[in-house]
């Protein structure tokens, strides 16, 4: 059963995420890629902007079927509670679906500016040569859900567990 307390309606989580993962249709398995992004909210419509080179598997798959699923997450922290001898993981995440559209040439600079603003608020100028060589896409969001598992840190037995080097499976 899903924990209703973890569902979140506000999407401020997006501003804290640094990568969006896009899942596309491929046969026989989905194809997923992590990309950086910018966002814009127009009325009730959420739009994500990404950039890519021209050509490649991602572009080929999106040309066949522009419908995608996406995921982003942030604020990861492994913690331990001595009182009940349990570990858990703090996180915030957003998942959803959307449709990818190519950004027209005359709107590419706006898309790249929104992308840069997600990571750095200062204005930057773009070299027209590189803007021309960059393909921009927008993801028009159909639906999206946010979740948060952020237990309070104010209990005396709450201990953050530091990751030790690489995170890897003991089976590898």
Report each predicted region and the residues it spans.
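Short, basic/aromatic recognition patches
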Residues: 1-21
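Charged, gly/pro-rich active-site loop segments
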Residues: 2, 77-172
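A generic structural signal for nonpolar/aromatic side chains embedded in well-ordered alpha-helices
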Residues: 13-14, 61-62, 115
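Short beta-strand segments
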Residues: 17-54, 70
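Short, structured patches in soluble enzyme cores that scaffold and shape functional sites
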Residues: 24-26, 52, 72-74, 100, ...
């Amino acid at each position: 059963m899903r924990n209703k307390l973890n569902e979140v309606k506000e999407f401020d989580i997006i501003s804290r995420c640094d990568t969006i993962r896009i899942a596309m249709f491929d046969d026989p398995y989905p194809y997923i890629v992590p990309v950086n992004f910018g966002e814009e909210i127009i009325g009730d419509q959420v739009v994500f902007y990404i950039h890519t080179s021209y050509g490649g598997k991602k572009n080929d798959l999106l040309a066949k079927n522009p419908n995608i699923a996406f995921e982003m997450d942030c604020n990861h922290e492994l913690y331990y509670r001595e009182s009940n001898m349990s570990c858990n993981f703090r996180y915030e995440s957003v998942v959803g679906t959307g449709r990818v559209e190519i950004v027209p040439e005359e709107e590419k600079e706006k898309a790249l500016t929104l992308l840069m603003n997600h990571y750095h608020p200062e204005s930057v100028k773009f070299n027209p040569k590189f803007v021309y060589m960059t393909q921009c896409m927008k993801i028009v969001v159909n639906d999206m859900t946010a979740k948060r598992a952020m237990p309070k840190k104010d209990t005396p037995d709450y201990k953050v567990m530091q990751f030790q080097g690489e995170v890897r499976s003991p089976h590898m």
